[in-house]
């Protein structure tokens, strides 16, 4: 009996030993998997347990981990003392051995951060497990943020400026280029799309408006989310939304679906400007920030030039189209819409190779991720400069104390979409709270003044840049009307018309037994005329009307002479057979006017190149405020030259002049917006101000274009007053040149 009891006790003790050994090895393998980090940025591998044996079959090397006598006793006796119970001697590491990514909480007494600030067992400036009670939390976060700003600037200087920043520059430039393309797409396709989709004037106006509406919503939405979810992630999502719906819009046939796709395409691209500038600024040291953010602005100009060049090269080529029956038509303007999605697609592919902003990681307490990205920046630049041996010396980086914003979701909280709804509401509340913090007493004055500057700048710039082409078209129409030929009181009998009539007025004419076969009528008007025993076949017309005319025994076969083209006219015993299918509205289609739109836009966007270069070279020398105010004053002065624009060439020259001097103020405003707000509010504030910019653009376009053909005084007065007000407000803002990024 006793022998059986001893056997059972030995069996139980052996089972416990086996279980303990399995548990120990399982824990070690988990830790080993976590600590064996592949540094994807420097391509170096590190492992805490590189030389540790996983199995007793492979003895540890002579220089392996220290194993004390307690461990030998445990192996020999199968027991452990109270002093060593729960302690895994295999995890002891020699001093100086790599122990994974440096972490802020791993610093011991006497250790210091990169900027020299002491760090003793803290993370984000707070002791583990301790948080500042009550109102001390925000004060501590503010103090942490100030220390982080100084240290982050020091780290960026150590990382240097080189290949990494230039690579990111071109990647983000593609995203900014996509925004520049989006602004011009609808305006370029309207002359062609209006006939395919049979667009009335109100529909065309809504199509132009919907793009700005989508960009306004997208700027606010993605700007707010980028401060919570990350710059890179939100930019990838927003560009994906833009490219997907831009692709769909090139194939859809109906006006409603096309409008919907362009709306969502605008929502997607709306996040480009606020995220791109914030993202890039967080990789730039103070002495490089103003200049290189200004260089980045050039890609918006490149986007406009790309759109104008592609429209010029693609849309007039009718051979690039096909159709399947009468229901589906794919014309060349749809190819243009598809090509305009390429910058966004390429930006997505390139952005997947780039890391998240390390400043965003640090603001959200992710020390290890930030350290890895900064190490990548350092190693990339040092290798490019021929110094691969230089080691990234930073070991500890300040992080911001994180407030607990998590919500508890019970496991029985309905279905999965209800749980996602709760998370979405929580995220929305955080975004809204962050937006409201931009109006806190600390930032209220800056935000209100920036709203004024953004609104006035956008109101005048977009209003004038759209007013210029409209004025050019008006001058063309006036010149065209001045060359109209008038034929009064003509009498024509037994004549066949099979040629083109253009820009003519026929008054009091009489037409007997005449045939109009294969005739094209363009801007032709028949007034007080009589048509008797006439025959119209295969007639195509645009801007053609019959006013106060009489038709007797006349046949219309396969024509597009719809009812609205007969104004106060009588049709006696007349017949319409097999009218042409398609849009019954009178549209002009593509032609010389469309070419002029492409040409004017091409020159207008290309003209900002000198202003971009000058602003980039002087931004860090004269300061943001002087650049902004000076450019606004020059733009205001250039407005007064509009009174001399009495010809097409003069208006084109004035458009180029205004664009060239005003671009510097936009560059300065972008840099100023980035530097005035802290990292946790940067894209939120930028997105809100950019959304306000799009609202001002809609108002400016609506007001300025309403005066086309009426007066030039009102646009000159409105633009000058807005620019003067904006420059005066800008001078009251704080100068950010020479300051570290908050």
UniProtKB/Swiss-Prot annotation:
Keyword set includes Phosphoprotein: yes
Cytoplasmic side: 1-169, 227-233, 284-294, 356-447, 620-626, 673-685, 732-742
Post-translational modification: Phosphorylation by CK1 of the N-terminal cytoplasmic domain regulates interaction with SYT1. N-glycosylated.
Modified residues (Phosphotyrosine): 480
Region (Interaction with SYT1): 1-57
Compartments, record wording: Presynapse; Cytoplasmic vesicle, Secretory vesicle, Synaptic vesicle membrane
Matches recorded under InterPro entries: LD_SV2 (IPR055415), MFS (IPR011701), MFS_dom (IPR020846), MFS_sugar_transport-like (IPR005828), MFS_trans_sf (IPR036259), Sugar_transporter_CS (IPR005829), SV2 (IPR022308)
Annotated segments matching region Disordered: 40-145
Compositionally biased residues, Basic and acidic residues: 40-49
Recorded coiled-coil stretches: none
Summary of subunit composition and partner proteins: Interacts with SYT1/synaptotagmin-1 in a calcium-dependent manner. Binds the adapter protein complex AP-2. (Microbial infection) Interacts with C.botulinum neurotoxin type A (BoNT/A, botA).
Record protein name field: Synaptic vesicle glycoprotein 2A
UniProt organism field: Mus musculus
Lineage of source species: Eukaryota, Metazoa, Chordata, Craniata, Vertebrata
């Amino acid at each position: 009996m006793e022998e059986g009891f001893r056997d059972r006790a030995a069996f139980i003790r052996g089972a416990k030993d086996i279980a303990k050994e399995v548990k120990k090895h399982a824990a070690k393998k988990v830790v080993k998997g976590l600590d064996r980090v592949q540094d994807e940025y420097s391509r170096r591998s590190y492992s805490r347990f590189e030389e540790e044996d996983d199995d007793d079959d492979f003895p540890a090397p002579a220089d392996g981990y220290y194993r004390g006598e307690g461990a030998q006793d445990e192996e020999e006796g199968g027991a452990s003392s109270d002093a060593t119970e729960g302690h895994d001697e295999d995890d002891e590491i020699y001093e100086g051995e790599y122990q994974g990514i440096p972490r802020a909480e791993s610093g011991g007494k006497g250790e210091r951060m990169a900027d020299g600030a002491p760090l003793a067992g803290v993370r984000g400036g707070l002791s583990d497990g301790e948080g500042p009670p009550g109102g001390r939390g925000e004060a501590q976060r503010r103090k942490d943020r100030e220390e982080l700003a100084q240290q982050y600037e020091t780290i960026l200087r150590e990382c240097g400026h080189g290949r990494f920043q230039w690579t990111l520059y071109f990647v983000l430039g593609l995203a900014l280029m996509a925004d520049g393309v989006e602004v011009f797409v609808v305006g370029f396709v309207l002359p062609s799309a209006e006939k395919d989709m049979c667009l009335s004037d109100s529909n065309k106006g809504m199509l132009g408006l919907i793009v700005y509406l989508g960009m306004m919503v997208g700027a606010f939405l993605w700007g707010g989310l980028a401060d919570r979810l990350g710059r890179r992630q939100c930019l990838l999502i927003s560009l994906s939304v833009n490219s997907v719906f831009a692709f769909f819009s090139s194939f859809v046939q109906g006006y409603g679906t096309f409008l919907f796709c362009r709306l969502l395409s605008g929502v997607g691209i709306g996040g480009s400007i606020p995220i791109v500038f914030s993202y890039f600024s967080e990789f730039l040291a103070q002495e490089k920030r103003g200049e290189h953010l200004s260089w980045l602005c050039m890609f918006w100009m490149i986007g406009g030039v790309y759109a104008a060049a592609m429209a010029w090269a693609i849309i007039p080529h009718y051979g690039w189209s096909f159709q399947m029956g009468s229901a589906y038509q794919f014309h060349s303007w749809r190819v243009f819409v598809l090509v305009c999605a390429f910058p966004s697609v390429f930006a997505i592919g390139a952005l997947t190779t780039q890391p998240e902003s390390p400043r965003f990681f640090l603001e959200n307490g992710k020390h290890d991720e930030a350290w890895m990205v900064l190490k990548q920046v350092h190693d990339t630049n040092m290798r490019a400069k021929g110094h691969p041996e230089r080691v990234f010396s930073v070991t500890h980086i300040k992080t911001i104390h994180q407030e607990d914003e998590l919500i508890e979701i019970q496991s029985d909280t309905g279905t999965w979409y209800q749980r996602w709804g709760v998370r979405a509401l929580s995220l929305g509340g955080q975004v809204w709270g962050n937006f409201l913090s931009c109006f806190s007493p600390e930032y209220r004055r800056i935000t209100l003044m920036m709203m004024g500057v953004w609104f006035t700048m956008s109101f005048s710039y977009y209003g004038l840049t759209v007013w210029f082409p409209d004025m050019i078209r008006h001058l063309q129409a006036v010149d065209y009307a001045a060359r109209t030929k008038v034929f009064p009181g003509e009498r024509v009998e037994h004549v066949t018309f099979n040629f083109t009539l253009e820009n003519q007025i026929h008054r009091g004419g009489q037409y007997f037994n005449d045939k109009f076969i294969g005739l094209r009528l363009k801007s032709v008007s028949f007034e007080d005329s009589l048509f008797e025993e006439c025959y119209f076949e295969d007639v195509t017309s645009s801007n053609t009307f019959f006013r106060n005319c009489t038709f007797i025994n006349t046949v219309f076969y396969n024509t597009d002479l719809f009812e609205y083209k007969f104004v106060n006219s009588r049709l006696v015993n007349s017949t319409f057979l097999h009218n042409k299918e398609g849009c019954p509205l009178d549209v002009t289609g593509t032609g010389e006017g469309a070419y002029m739109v492409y040409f004017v836009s091409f020159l207008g966007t290309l003209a900002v190149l000198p202003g971009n270069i000058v602003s980039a070279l002087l931004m860090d020398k004269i300061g943001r405020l002087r650049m902004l105010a000076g450019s606004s004053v020059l733009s205001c002065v250039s407005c007064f030259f509009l009174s001399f624009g009495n010809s097409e060439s003069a208006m084109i020259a004035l458009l180029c002049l205004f664009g060239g001097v005003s671009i510097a103020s936009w560059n300065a405003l972008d840099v100023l917006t980035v530097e005035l707000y802290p990292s946790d509010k940067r894209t939120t504030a930028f997105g809100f101000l950019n959304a306000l910019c799009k609202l001002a653009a809609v108002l400016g376009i609506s007001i300025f274009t309403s005066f086309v053909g009426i007066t030039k005084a009102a646009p000159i007065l409105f633009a000058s007053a807005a620019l003067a007000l904006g420059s005066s407000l800008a001078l009251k803002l704080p100068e950010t040149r020479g300051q570290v990024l908050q």
